[in-house]
Amino acid sequence: EKFPAVNQKPQAAXL
């Protein structure tokens, strides 16, 4: 969530 690029990935949301 902190990183914009990560927000693109559903798995990262999870983190």
UniProtKB/Swiss-Prot annotation:
The keyword Transferase does not apply. Plasma. Disulfide bonds: none annotated. Keywords: Blood coagulation cascade inhibiting toxin, Glycoprotein, Hemostasis impairing toxin, Secreted, Toxin. One of its GO terms (molecular function) is toxin activity. GO terms for cellular component: extracellular region. Coiled coil: none annotated. The keyword Secreted applies. It is found in: Secreted. Glycosylated. Binds to thrombin and inhibits blood coagulant activity. Does not inhibit the serine protease activity of thrombin or platelet aggregation activity. May bind to the heparin recognition exosite. Heteromer of subunit I and subunit II. This is Thrombin inhibitor subunit 1. It comes from Bothrops jararaca.
